[in-house]
């Protein structure tokens, strides 16, 4: 776990609980897609970057769930990299109390403010209009925003009726 794996000419991934994409901008500069779930993930990612003589220029967050932005704060302090995402995800990244508040429907009680639901705040520096050259944003809604629950829909999963709420992509 936490090993760098090459999958294309300029593309890699770091094997970890929330796999991290890595794209080479040139021989030394890279961007990563998401940053893992906490400071320790950030530390391990930073170690891999140093071992490969990579300079982190960007973190591109796919969304603001804590397991995708938890390493942002550590990596941004260490590397002064830029952090970019959509405008709304940037707000959740800058003000992580929004994540458990959104989940709970109000100000969260203490047990909802753990590292699994609330990452350390980091400072987004731009939005997806500022993607590095060679990268393109393709919206694939459905994992967080752009999804809604429908309690009146039932599917058959593996031939067995599945009566629980299903997420529909808008």
Q: Which sequence ranges carry the predicted segments?
A:
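Structural signal for conserved beta-strand scaffold positions within catalytic alpha/beta enzyme cores
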Residues: 6, 13, 85, 139, ...
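A generic "binding-loop/recognition-motif" signal
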Residues: 18-19, 65, 89, 151-152
């Amino acid at each position: 776990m936490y090993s760098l794996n090459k999958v294309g000419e300029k593309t890699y991934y770091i094997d970890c609980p929330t796999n991290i994409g890595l794209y080479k901008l040139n021989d030394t500069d890279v961007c990563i897609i998401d940053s893992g779930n906490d400071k320790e993930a950030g530390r391990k990612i930073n170690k891999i970057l140093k071992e490969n003589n990579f300079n982190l220029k960007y973190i591109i967050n796919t969304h603001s769930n804590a397991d995708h932005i938890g390493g942002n704060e550590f990596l941004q302090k260490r590397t002064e990299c830029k952090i970019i995402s959509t405008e709304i995800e940037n707000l959740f990244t800058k003000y992580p109390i929004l994540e458990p508040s959104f989940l709970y429907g109000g100000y969260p009680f203490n047990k909802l403010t753990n590292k699994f639901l609330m990452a350390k705040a980091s400072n987004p520096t731009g939005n997806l209009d500022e993607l590095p050259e060679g990268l393109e944003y393709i919206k694939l809604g459905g994992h967080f925003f752009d999804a809604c629950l429908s309690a009146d829909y039932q599917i058959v999963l593996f031939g067995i009726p599945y009566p629980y709420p299903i997420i529909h992509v808008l």
